[in-house]
Design a protein with these regions (language model features):
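Duplex nucleic acid-engaging cores and interfaces of nucleic-acid transaction enzymes
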Residues: 33, 49-52, 59, 63-315, ...
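Long, charge-rich intrinsically disordered scaffolds of nucleic-acid metabolism proteins
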Residues: 96, 399, 405, 410-480, ...
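Accessory alpha-helical DNA-binding modules that contact the DNA backbone or grooves
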Residues: 30-31, 46-145, 149, 337, ...
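Short beta-alpha connecting loops at secondary-structure transitions
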Residues: 341-346, 369, 411-424, 453-457, ...
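Long, charged amphipathic helices and adjacent flexible linkers at domain junctions
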Residues: 278-296, 450-481, 598-639
Length: 718
C-alpha cells in the first residue's frame, strides 16, 4: 500500500500537500506550528485537518506493520502462497487483515481442533467433495477408534472441522458483515419488565442497524452494562445461513446434506455470534468516535469563548451549610479579597448582616461583574446577587457559570501550589471568577473530561478521548498565544514544543530573574533548546519588548520579512509599537500581496498572517467574538415561563439530538434538532455552538420534571 497516495485520495488533497505534511510530522514538528508557520508547504491546512491526517497516517502505518507480522507468521508455517500474500497486502482494514490470518492463527482448543487431533480431517474432505455415490456412514467406519466410538461421532467431528473452516472464510465473513449492516436489526428488551430505570425507552426496542444513531447505541450499551437491558442483533429468518449454503453446498446427496448441516451450525454457533460481536463493537466505536468529535467541538468553543477583559470580578461558589465562598479578582486575575457569606440559610437581620459582607466587597473593589457557580444553592445566591447589584451607584451585571471541574481543580496539587494560603473552597471561588474573565486560561488547569460539555464521556475509550481533548486544548492555546511574563504553568505547558519540565523552568527563570524583555532571552531557559524554541517562539508574546514584533504571532524566522513588508507600506517597526495600524493591510493590497511576497521572500499566506499582526500587535482572536451574556434584571423562575415567550440564552451543551440553552432559570432548556432551524441538518453542530448567544421561544414547560422545551424557529405571524 502506498500510504501517501492513499491519504491524498482519502482527503482529496494534492499529493504535494500530503507528502510535505508527512515529512513535517516525521521531522517532529508540532501540529500548531505546522498549521501556523508552514502554510506554504501544506497548502494552508488547518490544525483539525492536520490532526485527522496524522491519526489516519498512524492507523495505516500500524496496518502495514501488522500485515508484515502476519505474512512472516504464515510464512514460518510454510503456508504463505503468492495469492494469499497479495490478499493480505491489499487488505484495507485491520479487521480484514485479521480475517485473512484467522485460519492460520494458533488456535485454542475447539471442537474442530479436537476432531483434527482424532484424525477426522480426511473424513471432512470426503464429505466436502459431496460425491453423490459416497455413503457417509460407510466412510466414517474407517475412522473409528477409542476416542471416536461410532460413526455418528466420526461424522459429527468431520462436520465440526467443516463448520470452523466455513466460519473462518475471510470472504464469507466480509459478506456476513455487509449483510448484518444492511439487513440486521438491533433489539433490546428489559431484564425486568416493570423496573424503573432511565432506559425505559429501550425496554421493547428495535431499529435497523444501518439507521441507528450514535447516542442510542451508547444509551443501549450503558443499559446493558448496568443490567437493565438485554441486547441482540438479528437477521431476517434464513438470511444468514443461506450465504453459507449457497457457497458450500453443491447438491442434496447424503454428503451434501451433512455439509448443509455443518453450514447451518457454522452460522449459528460460530459465524453469526462472531459477526454480531464485531458489529456491535463497530457500532460502539463509530458512536464513540462521533461523541468524542462532539465533545471536542464543544470544548473548542468553550475554550475559545470571548474573555471579559478589564473588569474586576467577584466569584461566588454557592453553598448552604458552609455558606457562599467569595473571591474578588482584579483585571489580571490577581486575588484582591476573599470571604464567606451565609446568604442562602440566614433570615431577617441575620441575612442583612450576611448581605453586607458582599455589599462591602462590591463597593470596596468597584466590582462590575459577578460570576456565580451553577451548583448547589446557586438559585438562592443569584437572587441575592441580583438584588445587591441593583443597589450599586454604577452599572454591574452577573453571569451564572459552569462549576464543572472547579472542585476537582481546587483540591488539586496545582491549585495548592498556586494558592497555598487559601483553603479548597476559596480556591473554587477564585476559579469561578477567573472563568468569566478568561475561560481559556482557567479551564486549561482542569482535566478536559471534567468540564462536562459532552455526552456519555464516561463511556468513551479513555486514551482516544484524552488524545482528542488534549489536541483541542493545544490548538486553542496556541491559536490565541500567551504572554511569556504572565502565563501560568498550565498555559505554558500546552504551547507547541514546551513540555511540563520546560514550562516549570520558564516560571522558575521568571521568578529568579524577573520579566523577560525579549524573545531571544528565552534561550537562557534550561532545556529550551533550538528545536523547542523553533516550535514555541511564535506562540509566546513579550508585551513591552524593545522589538514590537516580540508581542505578535510573527515567528522570529520571519522578522526580516515583516520589516520588509512594513518598509513596502511606508512604515517602520517603531510605528507599530503599542498601537494599531489598520491601514497597513489596505496599503499592502494596493501594492499587491503577490508582489510584496516576492520582495519579502515568503509565501502569500505568510504575508497575510504577518499583515494581521502588524495591523493589531498583540491581537487576541477571541476579541472578535460576541461578549458573554451578562444579566442584571429581575431573575425568572421556571414557573414564570409560558409557551410562546421569547428569551435570549447561551448554548451550554450541544449533543447529537439537540442543544441545551441557559435562559436564566437554572434549568437549561432543550432545543431538539428539529427545532434549531428550518433547513435540514444532520447534526446540531452545523447550526449552533457552545457559548453562542441565541434567541429562543418557549414551546412547553414541565414543572414536575423540571424540563423546558424550546425552539429557535421564530413563531409564524398571524
Amino acid at each position: 500500500m502506498n500510504i501517501p497516495q492513499k491519504l491524498a485520495a482519502e482527503f482529496q488533497l494534492r499529493q504535494e500537500q500530503i507528502d510535505n505534511t508527512i515529512a513535517l510530522l516525521d521531522d517532529g514538528k508540532t501540529i500548531p506550528f505546522i498549521a501556523r508557520y508552514r502554510k506554504e508547504r501544506t497548502g494552508s491546512l488547518d490544525d483539525q485537518v492536520l490532526r485527522a491526517i496524522d491519526n489516519r497516517l498512524q492507523y495505516l502505518r500500524k496496518l502495514e506493520q501488522r500485515k508484515e507480522e502476519i505474512c512472516t507468521a504464515i510464512e514460518a508455517q510454510g503456508k504463505l502462497t503468492p495469492e494469499l500474500e497479495e490478499k493480505i497486502r491489499g487488505a484495507e482494514t485491520l479487521v480484514e487483515t485479521e480475517d485473512l490470518y484467522l485460519p492460520y492463527r494458533p488456535k485454542r482448543k475447539t471442537r474442530a481442533s479436537m476432531a483434527i487431533a482424532r484424525g477426522l480431517e480426511p473424513l471432512a474432505r470426503i464429505l466436502m467433495a459431496q460425491n453423490p455415490r459416497t455413503n457417509p456412514a460407510q466412510e466414517a467406519e474407517a475412522f473409528l477408534q477409542e476416542e471416536v466410538p461410532d460413526t455418528e461421532a466420526a461424522l459429527q467431528g468431520a462436520m465440526d472441522v467443516l463448520a470452523e473452516e466455513m466460519a473462518n472464510d475471510a470472504d464469507l465473513r466480509k459478506q456476513m458483515r455487509r449483510l448484518v449492516m444492511s439487513a440486521g436489526t438491533i433489539q433490546s428488551r428489559a431484564t425486568e419488565e416493570d423496573a424503573d430505570t432511565p432506559y425505559q425507552n429501550y425496554y421493547d426496542y428495535a431499529e435497523p442497524v444501518k439507521r441507528i444513531v450514535g447516542h442510542r447505541i451508547l444509551a443501549i450499551d450503558r443499559g446493558e452494562r448496568e443490567g437493565a437491558l438485554k441486547v441482540a442483533v438479528t437477521l431476517p429468518e434464513g438470511h444468514g445461513a443461506s450465504l453459507l449454503i449457497q457457497k458450500f453446498v453443491k447438491n442434496q446427496s447424503p454428503c451434501g446434506k451433512l455439509v448443509q448441516t455443518a453450514a447451518e451450525d457454522a452460522f449459528q454457533r460460530l459465524l453469526f455470534p462472531a459477526v454480531e460481536r464485531e458489529t456491535r463493537k463497530a457500532l460502539t466505536e463509530q458512536a464513540a468516535t462521533a461523541a468524542i468529535g462532539v465533545f471536542a467541538s464543544n470544548l473548542r468553543q468553550l475554550l475559545m469563548a470571548a474573555p471579559l477583559k478589564n473588569r474586576i470580578v467577584l466569584g461566588v461558589d454557592p453553598g448552604y451549610r458552609t455558606g457562599c465562598k467569595l473571591a474578588v479578582v482584579d483585571e489580571t486575575g490577581k486575588v484582591l479579597d476573599t470571604g464567606v457569606a451565609h446568604i442562602t440559610v440566614s433570615k431577617g437581620a441575620s441575612l442583612e448582616r450576611e448581605k453586607d459582607v458582599i455589599r462591602k466587597m462590591l463597593r470596596k473593589h468597584h466590582v462590575t461583574a459577578v460570576a456565580i457557580g451553577n451548583g448547589t444553592a446557586s438559585r438562592e445566591s443569584e437572587a441575592v446577587v441580583a438584588e445587591l447589584l441593583k443597589e450599586l451607584p454604577y452599572s454591574a451585571a452577573y453571569m451564572v457559570v459552569s462549576e464543572a471541574g472547579a472542585s476537582v481543580y481546587s483540591a488539586s496539587k496545582l491549585a495548592a501550589e498556586e494558592f497555598p494560603e487559601y483553603d479548597v473552597s476559596l480556591r473554587s471561588a477564585v476559579s469561578i471568577a477567573r472563568r468569566l474573565q478568561d475561560p481559556l486560561a482557567e479551564l486549561v488547569k482542569i482535566d478536559p473530561q471534567a468540564i462536562g460539555v459532552g455526552q456519555y464521556q464516561h463511556d468513551m475509550p479513555k486514551a482516544e478521548l484524552s488524545a482528542a481533548l488534549d489536541g483541542v486544548v493545544e490548538d486553542c492555546v496556541n491559536h490565541v498565544g500567551v504572554d511569556l511574563n504572565t502565563a501560568s504553568f498550565s498555559l505554558l505547558s500546552h504551547i507547541a514544543g514546551i513540555n511540563q519540565t520546560i514550562a516549570k523552568n520558564i516560571v522558575t527563570y521568571r521568578t529568579e530573574n524577573g520579566a523577560f524583555t525579549d524573545r531571544k532571552q528565552r534561550k537562557k531557559v534550561a532545556k529550551l533548546g533550538p528545536k523547542a524554541f523553533e516550535q514555541c517562539a511564535g506562540f509566546l508574546r513579550v508585551s513591552g519588548a524593545k522589538n514590537p514584533l516580540d508581542n505578535t504571532a510573527v515567528h522570529p524566522e520571519s522578522y526580516g520579512a515583516a520589516e520588509q513588508i512594513l518598509q513596502e507600506c511606508g512604515f517602520q517597526l517603531a510605528d507599530i509599537a503599542g498601537q494599531d495600524r489598520s491601514e497597513i493591510g489596505a496599503i499592502a493590497k494596493q501594492h499587491g500581496i503577490s508582489a510584496i511576497a516576492k520582495k519579502a521572500g515568503v509565501g502569500e499566506p505568510t504575508v497575510r498572517d504577518i499583515l494581521k499582526e502588524l495591523e493589531k500587535p498583540g491581537r487576541d482572536p477571541r476579541d472578535e467574538l460576541p461578549p458573554p451574556l451578562l444579566r442584571s434584571g429581575d431573575i425568572m423562575e421556571l414557573k414564570d415561563l409560558k409557551p410562546g415567550m421569547e428569551l435570549v440564552g447561551t448554548v451550554r451543551n450541544v449533543i447529537d439530538f439537540g442543544c441545551f440553552v441557559d435562559v436564566g432559570v437554572h434549568e437549561d432548556g432543550l432545543v431538539h434538532i428539529s427545532q434549531i432551524c428550518d433547513r435540514f441538518i444532520k447534526h446540531p453542530l452545523e447550526a449552533v455552538k457552545v457559548g453562542e448567544v441565541v434567541k429562543v421561544w418557549v414551546l412547553d414547560v414541565d414543572l414536575k420534571r423540571k424540563r423546558i422545551a424550546l425552539t429557535m424557529k421564530p413563531p409564524k405571524k398571524g
